[in-house]
Amino acid sequence: MELLLALIPFVLIFLLLIVFRLPAVKAMPLVFLATLLLITTYWKITTDVLVASSLRAGLIFIELFLIILFAVLLINLYKESGMIKKIESSLASISPDYRVQAMLIAWAFVALIEGAAGFGTPVALAAPFLVMLGFPAVKAIIIGLIGDSTAVTFGAAGTPIIVGLSSAGLSGEEIANTVVTSALIHLPLAIIATLSISYVITRKTQGFKEFIPFSIFSALAFTIPYTLTAIFLGPELPSIIGGISAILLISMAGKYNFLTPKHVLSYKKDVKPVNLSHIGKPLIPFLVMILALVVTRNWSYLNEKLTSIELGFDNLLDTGISQALQPFYTPSFYFLLAMLIAIPLFGIKKKSINFAFSESLNKIKYAMITLVFVLLTAQFILYSDINTSGLEGITTVIADSLASVLGSNFIYFSPVLGALGTFVTGSSTVSNLLFASIQVDTALTIGTSSVLMASLQAIGSAAGNMFAIHNVVTATAVVGIKKGEGEIIKYNLFIAILYCLAAAVLAVLLF
């Protein structure tokens, strides 16, 4: 009975978005109301917990709103200044083939940004940029989200591992082994992601088959340095080093036609290639932003100083619920930094700035309404364990019930559970905090390695990023489309489940 009730919010999301194809701006308020009714009547959440979790959702909303607004505004400033045309021409000089461009942006660039910042930043940058290169909006979102998968395990300088596994009861040695095991499983699985990106933009044409070698090369250009970094340096740098390596290797391969198909597929036939030296000026704001993100995430002194400045609350209303906004550490601050550099560097006039700002607000307004209900629903589910009914929280009920039913076969569901956590919360780190201890406890019960189960949790929570509902809403906001969330979730759900099942099978066979 409890399991069926706990599944109601998830089933509703599936039915409303995927089966009935309602836009998220209509579907998510209904899911929110159903969840509110469920947690107040059956789980018996108190008013204090409702208020505290709502305020926590509010602070998270402010952070996401600023990330989305500044990302869209930065792209619009590039459009207003004409710099986007120079980037298009420079990319064409690497390769005019949109398949190569997809690997460069939706895979390698997204991985680098994920490694440095995480928190929805990669797709907020990549999706609108892909659209301006000619990619259809929905496809741009789908491939941007697929690309933001393998890198997520070590995203935001290793936060999903360092913070996410902190409550799993693992020793330091076990966490180190989890880092290595996760990377080794990801190593071949990344090919699923790059092949999926290629398939989305070419479908069943010859263009997909002839691009398979380059897709595999693109995956390995990231995962080989990523895995070596995880083995020798730990969880902070794999996605950053892998992303930089992939950008360089894919660019060189595209430029010198290594493994590229003879037939070139291009969305924009009229873009003329230019010398790569022309890309220097347009890239300066992006490079400064990326460098600042990498430095602030990996220089412990600066990291400590920036994160010490907080706006928020601790143990609100004596519920144990806390949240803080770190204004100089949040990714939105670095988007703002990039804009402050771009405006004088590109000579953007006040009229163009005002127009870009107005366009940006208009583009994201409906998605922001949706995001409010997504975050409220997620927080209510997350804190449903603080109740007067004596029940476990909604996510724990689901995890424990499935572990009880599946027994030793739970290992095949383990990464799917991690993906479910990310789908609800929008965060691999939070998914790991929610489920890693359950995964480890289940491993001990069924006689499986705790390290292996923790690794599958970390991998699954990364795969869940492909269809996490708040990531989908963020992506539709920055691209400016008002429907299609169900199609995006349906498509990426299939790829994420495939990724999860392949991870489980590989783990059983090799470890």
What are these regions (language model features)?
Residues 180-195, 360-394, 398, 402-511:
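C-terminal transmembrane helix pair
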Residues 1-73, 85-90, 94-95, 271-275, ...:
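Hydrophobic transmembrane alpha-helices of multi-pass solute/ion transporters
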Residues 24, 153, 157-266, 459-511:
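Juxtamembrane and boundary regions of transmembrane helices in multi-pass small-molecule transporters
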Residues 101-209, 400, 409, 424-458:
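Hydrophobic transmembrane alpha-helices that form the pore/transport pathway of multi-pass ion
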Residues 43-51, 83, 116, 158-175, ...:
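Transmembrane helix-loop junctions in multi-pass membrane proteins
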Residues 56-69, 176-192, 236-250, 286, ...:
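Alpha-helical transmembrane segments
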Residues 51-59, 63-136, 142, 348-440:
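Membrane-embedded alpha-helical segments and adjacent helix-loop junctions characteristic
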Residues 8-20, 31-41, 68-73, 110, ...:
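Hydrophobic core segments of alpha-helical transmembrane domains in multi-pass membrane transport
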